[in-house]
Structure formats: C-alpha cells, structure tokens
From Swiss-Prot:
Task of the protein: Hydrolyzes ureidoacrylate to form aminoacrylate and carbamate. The carbamate hydrolyzes spontaneously, thereby releasing one of the nitrogen atoms of the pyrimidine ring as ammonia and one of its carbon atoms as CO2.
Originating species: Caulobacter sp. (strain K31)
The protein's name in its UniProt record: Ureidoacrylate amidohydrolase RutB
Name of the top EC class for this enzyme: hydrolase
E.C. code: 3.5.1.110
Keyword field: Hydrolase
HAMAP family: RutB
Record-annotated active site: 29 (proton acceptor), 138, 171 (nucleophile)
Length: 233
C-alpha cells in the first residue's frame, strides 16, 4: 500500500516498497556522447535512435521525483582532457573502451570524445540539472567506482536507488550491480533506459537485474505510485 511516506512500486519480479526519504533517482550518463547525433556512441556505430524517447521519459520521472522530495543524482562519464584518467595500455579500460578505440582508429576525433569540458561530455540540453540536484563524475562504467556516490547516499540515509539513463547493459547495470554489493536496493525503469548494442542486450540486462540484482519497473508505474502517495497525503 502506498502511503505519504512510502511508495509501493509495481515491479518485476515483485512490487517493491520505496521509502520516499530513503530513495534517490540516479540519472546515468545522459550526455551528448550517448544520446545525441554526432556523439561518441553514434560515431562508434551504435544505434541511438531510441535515445530521444528515453529523454522524454526521464524528464517526466525527474519532475515527479523532485516534487516528492527525492534527490536527483546525475552522472557524467568520461575523463580529463589529456585522458590520464582513462588509463594507458596497462589498463583494461584502454583496450576495451569503445570511445578510446574509436579515437585511435580515427585520429581526427582525438580529444573530442568523453573529454571533460567538451560538448561530447556535456549533458543533453533537455536534461540539465536543476537547483538542488547533485552532479557526480565517473571514469569507469560503475558509478560507485572511485566516485563520491556511496558517501553522498550514506550521508543522506539513502538505501533505494531508481535508475534511468544510458546504457542499460553497460553503465546502468554496472552501477546497479555495485550498489547491490553495497546493500543498496536498485530498481531500473526500463522505458527510461536504452542499450548500447542490439535489442537483445537490453532484454538480457533487464533479465539479469530482475533475476539477480534488483527490480524492473516502468515510468508510468513510478509516476503512478508517486501520484497515489500524494493522494494518500
């Protein structure tokens, strides 16, 4: 039952109770790199055609979350302009990052992809943070790795994380998994996420999450649960 203090969110594999004062919305990497034509994913050959719809879904989620008093935490993924944080050949990231590989294959892009301070790194215009929102940076797929996220959450008593953003199968899943290991309850809103790769990787990521690491819900159910809370108040 939804009350003024708790949302009962319909989800898979079962509904989950979200205490409003212990829940934050985590916005993963809604940057030009991942959601805009001419950004890194687009230049690397990934299909970003679903990103526009995801942006609209996220806007609706953030509006109701802010209205309910939930913290909104934005992540941006990338590195310093000299790519020191990306790691050199001794780092697996140097070998596996598609952004770094794309720049090595196309030298004219060197310094343009995921470089802090550049257009590619910037959040998309439609999802700029509002006063009171929190912005964090990360240099690897997981938002918990070498970032302030854990301390930001613990200092606010946050135990429940609602995830939106790109890419479902990479940074969203990586951050939710790491949160699971740190005793956070993670829920992803499936229609407010988009994958990097074929459709089947979206399905696989959501299967992994709902079966092993967390819960899967929708933007409509999230907004509906918030609305029921307001009615209960």
């Amino acid at each position: 039952m939804t009350t003024p203090d708790t949302l009962m969110l319909p989800a898979r594999p079962e509904p989950i109770a979200l205490p409003v004062d212990k829940t934050a919305v985590i916005v993963i990497d809604m940057q030009n790199a991942y959601a805009s034509p001419g950004g890194y994913l687009d230049l690397a050959g990934f299909d970003i055609s679903g990103a526009a719809a995801v942006i609209d879904k996220i806007k609706g989620v953030l509006d109701v979350a802010r209205g309910a008093g939930m913290p909104v935490i934005y992540f941006q993924n990338g590195w310093d302009s000299d790519y020191v944080e990306a790691g050199g050949p001794g780092s697996p990231n140097w070998h596996k990052s598609n952004a770094l590989k794309t720049m090595r294959a196309r030298p004219e892009l060197q310094g343009k992809l995921l470089a802090r301070g550049g257009w590619d790194y910037d959040l998309v215009d439609a999802l700029k943070p509002e006063p009171g929102d929190i912005q964090l940076h990360k240099t690897r797929y997981s938002g918990f790795f070498n970032s302030q996220l854990d301390s930001v959450l613990r200092s606010r008593g946050i135990r429940h994380l609602v995830f939106v953003g790109i890419a479902t199968n990479v940074c969203v899943e990586s951050t939710l998994r790491d949160g699971f290991f740190l005793e956070y309850f993670g829920t992803v809103l499936e229609d407010a996420t988009h994958q990097a790769g074929p459709d089947f990787v979206q399905k696989a990521a959501l299967y992994n999450i709902e079966t092993f690491f967390g819960w899967v819900s929708t933007t409509a159910d999230f907004k509906g649960a918030v609305g029921q809370r307001e009615g209960a108040g």
